[in-house]
Amino acid sequence: MNPNQKIITIGSICMVIGIVSLMLQIGNIISIWVSHSIQTGNQHQAEPCNQSIITYENNTWVNQTYVNISNTNFLTEKAVASVTLAGNSSLCPISGWAVYSKDNGIRIGSKGDVFVIREPFISCSHLECRTFFLTQGALLNDKHSNGTVKDRSPYRTLMSCPVGEAPSPYNSRFESVAWSASACHDGTSWLTIGISGPDNGAVAVLKYNGIITDTIKSWRNNILRTQESECACVNGSCFTVMTDGPSNGQASYKIFKIEKGKVVKSVELNAPNYHYEECSCYPDAGEITCVCRDNWHGSNRPWVSFNQNLEYQIGYICSGVFGDNPRPNDGTGSCGPVSPNGAYGIKGFSFKYGNGVWIGRTKSTNSRSGFEMIWDPNGWTGTDSNFSVKQDIVAITDWSGYSGSFVQHPELTGVDCIRPCFWVELIRGRPKESTIWTSGSSISFCGVNSDTVGWSWPDGAELPFTIDK
């Protein structure tokens, strides 16, 4: 073959290879286009892999999970019918408290992306329990955590994550803009209540299934505020308590009945010389009991109980085992406010069992440290300080904070009674520690009628952080 023939032969071979390669590329493009058309036609929208999406269709929750298999998204669906959380059962009989969750948020936040929070609380649907919390629009160990000791700011939001997990941007969902909040599930959807705005004109925004359904305007123009724990649902209606007025004197208190996110009824309590803040509410035999904070003049806790028509009764826990902080040493109680060390206070809870009461309280009488559960078999109505059970939760040498109640309905647990539970906030940072921030983690316990143990489950983070030095 002469040189010209060799050149022609090599050129022909290259041209054939090029044509074949071009045809393969065209075929590949057509294949990808057809595959994409089929996929989007079936799913209607592109979704990220390994993500769970919940949609609401005709009163049925549809759980959709996309699973990544060989770069192809396959959609699996499992429909879960909604229920009505009746709340008609009585509280389960219990002999003690079993540890349920601990998020270790501050320890994890020294190195990971964890929100600066306060006022965490837990609420359960018939499918899951979630931790709700008020963020400060900042992460731990970051410059924006500076000054987060402040209670009310436009940066605070209500968010939630699965119970027991540290609250981070990666596992949390936004619920509402709020510096005071509550949330609960009626068996069909989540109701959230978020209060934000100026002290002299704040507004509570009600959302149902994530959509704004109603609002409540401050009626006394003096820091409208709500529970900082779960609202309570009975037979499709949910109930919450709000306060508006002075934190150190007579204020105004209202109960709200809410159905599918809309206020259907409210009543203002006729409660002279009473002070209700940050109520912890739970259903029991079709009615609601709330145990609250007296920030004015009581070192024992006020309560209000009401039926679904908002017909109510009010009182104070009579026990000489006092539940607030600060408080005097245990002694003789009163069915009205106990005045010694009665000013200021802390959010807390109790569970009523007939004439008896489980009282949760800090171990210290004057600082937010330690926590214990006490069973006073006559404490709801009797004024002595005799009790029969004390269970340690946090040692007096470790910080605690707010505490509150939540319940697990029979639709979740499968038992024929309402399980009482509680959470404890473990506050760290300012004003007691040398940091630029204030935040907290949380633990929770549920009542059982079997073996339990007392111990100390503290926050456990070593401070200060890098940002504080």
From Swiss-Prot:
Localization (cell): Virion membrane; Host apical cell membrane
The EC number(s) this enzyme carries: 3.2.1.18
Entry binding sites for Ca(2+): D294, G298, D324
Residues noted as binding substrate in the record, renumbered to the chain: R118, R152, E277, E278, R293, R368
Region Hypervariable stalk region, annotated ranges: 36-90
MF-aspect GO terms: exo-alpha-sialidase activity; metal ion binding
Active site, per annotation: D151 (proton donor/acceptor), Y402 (nucleophile)
Superkingdom of origin organism: Viruses
Record PTM: N-glycosylated.
Record membrane topology: Single-pass type II membrane protein
Name of the protein in question: Neuraminidase
UniProt source species: Influenza A virus (strain A/Chicken/Hong Kong/715.5/2001 H5N1 genotype E)
